[in-house]
Curated annotation (Swiss-Prot):
InterPro entries the record matches: Hint_dom_C (IPR003586), Hint_dom_N (IPR003587), Hint_dom_sf (IPR036844), Intein_C (IPR030934), Intein_N (IPR006141), PolC_DP2 (IPR004475), PolC_DP2_cat_dom (IPR056172), PolC_DP2_central_dom (IPR056171)
NAD among keywords: no
Entry keywords, A to Z: Autocatalytic cleavage, DNA replication, DNA-binding, DNA-directed DNA polymerase, Exonuclease, Hydrolase, Multifunctional enzyme, Nuclease, Nucleotidyltransferase, Protein splicing, Transferase
Family under the similarity heading: Belongs to the archaeal DNA polymerase II family.
Domain of life: Archaea
A matching Pfam family: zf-DPOE
Function: Possesses two activities: a DNA synthesis (polymerase) and an exonucleolytic activity that degrades single-stranded DNA in the 3'- to 5'-direction. Has a template-primer preference which is characteristic of a replicative DNA polymerase.
Protein name, UniProt field: DNA polymerase II large subunit
Catalysed reactions listed for this entry: DNA(n) + a 2'-deoxyribonucleoside 5'-triphosphate = DNA(n+1) + diphosphate; Exonucleolytic cleavage in the 3'- to 5'-direction to yield nucleoside 5'-phosphates
Length: 1286
């Protein structure tokens, strides 16, 4: 990491000191032997070099990388790695080994080694023979190389060329038929998968003829080539997707980047790249490209009930784009004026996600009051611009029409990140100041004077003239000339509907009194319309007039103006996430089994009274727990500490051979041993002893909840005392032994002390000594820069963590015999304490410090803090078998998830992670722990931000699977299946696969690693067995929870890998490693596009006017990427737009306040009627087509195929038993009810009556209505008597 300033060094020293202090306490507590292990089980993460070494598994690589990076760039180092391997410094024996290690290590370095994955997508490397007998290098790429990105794909070829030169190997000399095969195969692959860039035949021929390395690949598609088959040096006739991707999206598309590295390394033999670049540039320049953008309605395609649309794509009255970043935006977060949030029905609260038209797909919403708010028409006809939240709340009930929803603040970095052209911005004060403006005019007279001095008209006094046609502007001017009067600087006009509409469209504020329109002030309006003080038309109207509206008003007024409309951005509401305690279902207090004795609540108290036989003392239970042995006295029990005071150790035995095993596998059969036994445990006595040891009485805690059974590998147990203390503090334990709170993340780079509920004095104690301008910190309104690992948590999270500190202190004092650590009296005392932040589907926690609290229900953190966390699942191309509506179909998981993402139930955070119930019932093939296949229901689908790298598994039967590093994989263990993390899978592991209609065992033969540049990864949650067939391999699912925080000491003391489940979730979402210091160079590259300047250069706005590429001005904008490897990479950030309060606006979305879907839909359509930029009829139609009809059809189908379950023991039946009761005597009930099938039927009918719905959609509703009636019969009409009306 680069050098840092003394201030930041002190900051990291504070963090490290706090971590060391907590670590010492945790180590001391663990030494007591009361936990499964006597050491802290969360290690501290190391640097990139160490991670690469761990990934490739070659000792000594880390030191080599550090030496190289000290004297050269990363790209150069990735090539020079080959020098070390060629010298066989790491034990290589063959050319294949040298080439393989060098290429994989180089790619691991190029992709920064984040999340433990080196070179995914390379199947193997081989040394082959040319026709002249010389040797050449062939690199076999697999289909998932797509996720590596074009640059990494191309550079892997360059690395291969560099190393083969060192080894004295010849270049690849292709045969003519091989070149023709490449041309045919790449074209065919494009027709199957659609390449990002399809090179021409000439380009393909040029690449293959000149590339010194043979780009080969494994078959990835079902289709075979029709010509050029059975070639001697091409091992398959099947289409090789990996090869096509590397040539098309790597070498062809990224040729300029490859050439740049070639020149830097002074490598010969690549001059042909220049020829290809020139040919491509020439062909593109000769084509006339259309300048501009078009409306994109993709964000509207999955519209559902209850989620309002705020603006249609590029529609008048929609969000007007303003470039800039506030201290609480950036990194997929956009800014809206708090007044806009209130006027839009309070549906957009702080942190609510909004699906947007451009530049990306979604953005978390933050309040920014330095941009303009909405313009509305009140019930009395007045038109008012509203720019502050207080006035918006006062007027919200009087609004009849929302003419303009206001401005939206999106940073330049978002356009860079999404590779989107810059589009014209609405004229704003930042732009005005770049063009010479200095002081905001106090009134319109001063604004006119500024224009007379040569400045552009200030944006506060601009009207949206470009929303009118020149003919309409003329009509407006002539009407005022004929019918208007002036009185005390007020223009008075008769109330004419057409004229009022014109005034509304240009956002001209006015009042309606006694049938007259009153405009005050009006001088600029009159000048723009070519009217003098007597309302006479100026001579300019008689001259030749410009054709555009904006040019016309400039011509008439003599003032320079820019467009106030700019580019309109469409948007609609996504689902807000919830910040809440993390709870399992059902939520336990302690990881201690109570079996069926605990009842449905898993009550330890109830279990302590349970007896298997009448008239016997209760509490003696038969429980399955891990076998442990005391090394001192040899006693065997389930306890972590023996009665003699010595820590016990697991006793491993082979269930097949019946022998005790010392190592990780049985020496006789090679299977992994287990450590499980049935024990008779007196739970009553244990509970009483726990209360006594804690100095508590039974009535102090009403309910302590355990678990039905342990699901970890060796089944160790937690102390019941921990559960009692948690229950007393109303806390719940997660699967790994920790207490967590889920929060929705929002970015923040600066804050004011008054916003976070912390005194100036306390902040100075934490190291905040001066504001961003270097002024000593003295008052709560100064702006302070947030360091990368300081966070704000919601107030509710603060309360929960405060309770957790009381749990930890009691635990230390009463159980471990140590002094309390926290000793807090109030929630505010949490400030300055350390926590662990963890994103779902990851295994790496990030150290953070709480420095305050957010009134909004979100967690604010530095963009680096959020970017340092990862999300993991399946690659989008993974094929899964879906059974829906009686049809079994194999489709990519990406397609299924996107088609079934029900946004009425979808969760989302600021980083764009979605998870939801599927829009209609569907099932997938799953396998239970015994290897028996079943069709299981999909209970949710999810879309996640992709991690930096992915892992590819290949089996001996030719199956391949691409997953994220923390994904759960199924492996055979003797006679049952267990789950392990993808990172823990080894070559030779037996995995279950689906082939020819049966589950069989297959072996992992290769594990490859690839950097991932895809935007998203995908997953789904499967009922009961929680696994699915992906590409023919049974594999686990992912969970879909929000990011979470836990107290540092809670994690260090109570987390144990031994508690992690084998069958559900596994080791995912567990802090297996702790990153103590964030290195900006090693985190998600999205954060590198964060702009950190105080103002944009004028070139940004000028480039946007001509729809130029964002990269055209990247060298002019101060972004994190330009600061990497300097002290400025973590401090000295600025922002272009300030905001007065990061928690302004609604704190809870109206969506969560409304209880029924009927109320939500009514509000959605009511709001659509009021917003000018929304077509309410189209909204109603879309809701029917994409939500209600799908739901009605799906539920009706599910009703006919439903199962039945017992209310007592939860046993499931395919059909109702003849006896009408369960074997246990419990009642049998259906799982799909009539009410759930009909729930949207009446609403759908009502929509068809009230809105202009197409005849086709109406008839679909009628058909569904008839189907439902034929299934359930006509609704009963209740006969009412006369008394019912009295």
């Amino acid at each position: 990491m680069a050098d840092i300033s003394p201030r930041m060094q002190e900051y990291y020293d504070r963090l490290n000191a706090g971590l060391a202090q907590a670590m010492e306490v945790a180590k001391t507590a663990r030494k007591t032997g009361l936990d499964p292990e006597t050491v802290v089980e969360i290690p501290i993460a190391n640097d990139l070099a160490d991670r690469v070494e761990a990934q490739v598994g070659i000792p000594g690589v880390a030191q080599m990388i550090r030496e190289l990076e000290a004297v050269m760039s990363r790209e150069e180092a990735s090539l020079h790695i080959g020098d070390y391997f060629a010298e066989k410094k790491f034990g290589e024996t063959t050319k294949e080994e040298i080439l393989d290690h060098a290429i994989r290590t180089a790619m691991a370095l190029l992709t920064e080694g984040v999340v433990s994955a080196p070179i995914e997508g390379i199947a193997k490397v081989a040394v082959k023979k040319n026709d002249d007998g010389s040797e050449y290098l062939a690199i076999y790429y697999a289909g998932p190389i797509r996720s590596a990105g074009g640059t990494a794909q191309a550079l892997s070829v360059l690395v291969g060329d560099y190393v083969r030169r060192i080894l004295g190997m010849s270049r690849y000399m292709p045969r003519e038929e091989e070149i023709e095969r490449y041309i045919e195969e790449i074209r065919q692959y494009n027709s199957i998968m659609s390449l990002q860039y399809l090179p021409s035949e000439r380009e393909i021929r040029l690449i293959i003829s000149n590339c010194p390395v043979c780009i080969d690949g494994e078959p990835t598609e079902k289709e075979e080539v029709s010509g050029h088959r059975n070639l001697e040096r091409v091992e398959t006739n099947t289409v090789r997707g990996g090869m096509a991707l590397v040539i098309a999206e790597g070498l062809a598309l990224k040729a300029p980047k490859v050439l740049k590295n070639v020149r830097k390394m002074k490598m010969d033999g690549w001059d042909w790249l220049e020829e290809m670049i020139q040919a491509t540039a020439g062909s593109s320049s000769s084509e006339e490209k259309e300048v501009g953008i078009h409306p994109k309605d993709k964000f509207l395609r999955d519209l559902i009930g209850g989620r309002p649309v705020f603006s249609y794509p590029m529609r008048e009255g929609g969000f007007r784009l303003v470039y800039g970043r506030s201290r609480n935006t950036g990194l997929a977060a956009a800014g809206l004026n708090p007044a806009t949030l209130h006027i839009l029905g309070d549906f957009l609260a702080v942190g609510t996600q909004m699906k947007i038209e451009r530049p990306g797909k979604a953005a978390g919403i933050s309040p920014v009051d330095s941009i303009q708010g909405p313009t509305v028409r009140l019930i009395n006809g007045d038109v008012v611009r509203i720019h502050d939240a207080k006035r918006a709340r006062e007027l919200s009930s009087q609004v009849s029409h929302i003419i303009d929803v206001g401005e939206i603040l999106i940073s330049y970095g978002e356009f860079m990140e999404n590779n989107h052209v810059l589009v014209p911005s609405a004229y704003c004060e930042s732009w005005w100041r770049l063009e010479g403006g200095t002081t905001r005019p106090a009134d319109e007279d001063e604004a006119i004077l500024q224009c007379e001095s040569g400045l552009y008209l200030h944006p506060d006094y601009l009207y949206l003239w470009d929303d009118l046609k020149p003919a309409e502007i003329r009509s407006l001017a002539e009407f005022i000339h004929k019918h208007g009067t002036l009185a005390d600087k007020t223009l008075i006009l008769p109330l004419d509907p057409t004229i009022k509409e014109y005034l509304e469209r240009v956002l001209c504020e006015h009042q309606v009194r006694e049938g007259m329109i009153r405009i005050t002030p009006c001088r600029i309006v009159l000048k723009c319309l070519g009217l003098d003080s007597s309302l006479a038309l100026s001579d300019s109207w008689e001259k030749e007039l410009p054709e555009s509206a904006l040019d016309l008003v400039q011509f008439l007024s003599g003032m320079k103006m820019r467009s106030k409309a700019g580019t309109r951005i469409g948007g609609r509401m996504g689902r807000p996430g919830k910040s809440k305690p993390r709870e399992m279902k059902p939520a336990p207090h302690v990881l201690f089994p109570v079996g069926e004795a605990g009842g449905s609540r898993r009550s330890v108290q109830e279990a302590s009274k349970f007896s298997y036989q009448a008239n016997t003392e209760g509490g003696n239970l038969q429980l399955e727990m891990g076998v442990r042995r005391c090394p001192a006295c040899g006693t065997e029990s389930y306890k972590n500490r023996c009665s003699c005071g010595t820590h016990t150790e697991p006793v491993l035995s082979c269930s097949r051979c019946g022998i005790e095993v010392q190592g990780p596998v049985c020496p006789q059969c090679g299977m992994e041993p287990t450590s499980v036994r049935q024990y008779t445990v007196n739970v009553r006595q244990m509970l009483q002893q726990a209360f006594a040891d804690l100095g508590m009485r039974d009535r102090d805690v009403e309910l302590v909840k355990g678990v039905k059974g342990l699901v970890s590998r060796n089944k160790p147990v937690e102390l019941i005392e921990k559960g009692v203390i948690r229950a007393a503090n109303k806390l719940f334990v997660f699967k790994d032994g920790t207490v967590r709170f889920d929060i929705i993340d929002m970015p923040l780079t600066h804050f004011r002390p008054r916003e976070i509920g912390v005194s100036v004095e306390r902040l100075r104690e934490l190291g905040y000594l001066q504001d961003i301008y270097g002024v000593p910190l003295q008052n709560p309104d100064q702006v302070l820069e947030l360091p990368p690992q300081d966070i704000l948590v919601p107030e509710g999270c603060g309360d929960y963590l405060f309770s957790c500190t009381r749990f930890i202190d009691t635990l230390l004092e009463k159980v471990y015999g140590l002094p309390p650590f926290y000793n807090l009296e109030t929630r505010s005392d949490l400030v300055g304490h350390l926590v662990i932040g963890l994103a779902p589907h990851t295994s790496a926690g990030v150290l953070a410090r709480i420095i305050g609290f957010s009134k909004a229900n979100v967690g604010y953190g530095h963009p680096f803090f959020h970017a340092a966390k990862r999300r993991n699942c399946f690659h989008g191309d993974t094929l899964i078998e879906i059974y829906a509506d009686g049809i079994l179909e194999e489709i990519p998981i990406r397609r299924f998830v996107l088609e079934h993402l029900d946004l009425s139930q979808a969760g989302v955070d600021a980083l764009g992670t979605f998870y939801a119930d599927p829009v209609r019932p569907a099932h997938v093939r799953s396998v239970d722990t015994g290897g028996i296949p079943h069709l299981r229901k999909i209970t949710s689908v999810s879309v996640h931000k992709a991690p930096a790298n992915l892992i590819q598994f290949s089996t001996s039967r030719g199956k391949n699977l691409l997953v994220t590093p923390d994904h759960a994989m199924l492996v055979w263990d003797v006679s049952y299946l267990r789950k392990i993390r993808a990172l823990e899978v080894k070559i030779g592991d037996a995995v279950p696969v689906w082939e020819s209609g049966v589950v069989i065992s297959d072996r992992i033969v290769s594990i490859d690693y690839v950097p991932c540049e895809d935007e998203r990864v995908y997953c789904l949650t499967v009922d009961r067995d929680h696994n699915v067939v992906g590409n023919g391999i049974f594999t686990g699912q992912c969970d879909g929870d929000e990011d979470c925080v836990m107290l540092l000491l809670d994690g260090l003391i109570n987390f144990s890998r031994s508690f992690l489940p084998v069958t559900r979730g596994g080791s995912m979402d567990a802090p297996l490693v702790l990153t103590s210091r964030i290195d900006p160079t090693e985190i998600d590259k999205e954060s590198h596009n964060l702009d950190v300047c105080a103002t944009y250069p004028i070139e940004v706005y000028e480039t946007a006017l001509r729809y130029g590429n964002a990269k055209d001005v990247e060298s002019l904008v101060d972004r994190v990427e330009r600061r990497l490897n300097t002290p400025a990479q973590i401090e000295g950030f600025f922002f272009t737009h300030d905001t007065s309060d990061i928690s302004a606006g609604p704190l809870e979305t109206m969506y969560t306040q409304l209880q029924s879907m009927l109320d939500k839909l009514d509000c959605e359509l009511s709001l659509a009627k009021r917003i000018r930029a929304v077509d309410e009829h189209d909204v109603a139609e879309r809701v029917l087509k994409t939500h209600f009809i799908r739901d009605l059809q799906g539920n009706l189908s599910a009703f006919s195929k439903q199962k039945f379950r017992c209310t007592k023991c939860n046993t499931s039946y395919r059909r109702m038993p003849l006896a009408g009761k369960c074997k246990c005597g419990g009642n049998i009930i259906p799982t799909v009810h009539e009410g759930s099938v009909k729930k949207y039927l009446q609403m759908s009918r009502q929509i068809c009556e009230e809105y202009n719905i197409t005849e086709y959609t109406r008839q679909r509703i009628e058909v569904i209505d008839m189907n439902i009636e034929s299934t359930f019969g006509e609704e009963k009409v209740e006969q009412m008597g006369l008394a019912d009306f009295m």
